[in-house]
């Protein structure tokens, strides 16, 4: 990914937005699992969130666009984690400006997605986004919480 160029930055942001749409689809899966599960369930519990993980991880890895893929999801108590990988870029090639744009772009998209709000954020489940380069080396990680979405 040519993230040192403006077109690369734009492609990365388009990929991020597409990734948010994948996250929204996962939110619908969370709602389905929540409705079909037992009557009283702590939806923030690691046990419940890991049931969601087990249901959706067979869908991955999945290309978000030519530059980005979602590799898997994971969970811990009160936190649902999305793992993304930039498939064509090494950590040394990443423009710091692109990384700086990640959090606000993903936050806006997540907070605007009703499925994400209703199935995660309003249930006080933190969303964690973890990004790595083509070799799996860490690039960025951040959380989105109720406070970020103002709910």
Label each residue range with its predicted role:
Residues 11-31:
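Hydrophobic membrane-insertion alpha-helices, especially the h-region
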Residues 33, 59, 63, 109, ...:
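Solvent-exposed amphipathic alpha-helical surface segments
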Residues 1-8:
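N-terminal Lys/Arg-rich, disordered targeting/topogenic segments
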Residues 34-77:
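N-proximal, solvent-exposed amphipathic alpha-helical segments enriched in charged/polar residues
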Residues 92-118:
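Short, non-transmembrane amphipathic alpha-helical segments
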Residues 42-45, 49, 82, 92-100, ...:
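Solvent-exposed, acidic/flexible segments
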Residues 67-71, 76-81, 85-93, 117-151:
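Polar/charged, Gly/Pro-rich intrinsically disordered segments
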């Amino acid at each position: 990914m040519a993230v040192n160029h403006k077109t690369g930055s734009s492609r990365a942001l388009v990929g991020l937005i597409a990734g948010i749409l994948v996250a929204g689809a996962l939110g619908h899966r969370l709602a389905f699992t929540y409705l079909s599960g037992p009557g009283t369930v702590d939806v923030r519990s690691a046990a419940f969130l890991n049931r969601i993980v087990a249901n959706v991880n067979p869908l991955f890895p999945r290309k978000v666009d030519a530059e980005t893929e979602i590799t898997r999801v994971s969970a811990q108590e009160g936190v649902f984690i999305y793992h993304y990988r930039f498939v064509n870029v090494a950590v040394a090639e990443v423009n710091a400006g692109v990384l700086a744009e990640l959090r606000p772009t993903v936050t806006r998209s997540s907070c605007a997605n009703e499925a994400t709000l209703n199935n995660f954020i309003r249930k006080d489940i933190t969303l964690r986004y973890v990004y790595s380069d083509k070799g799996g080396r860490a690039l960025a990680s951040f959380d989105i919480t109720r406070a970020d979405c103002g709910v």
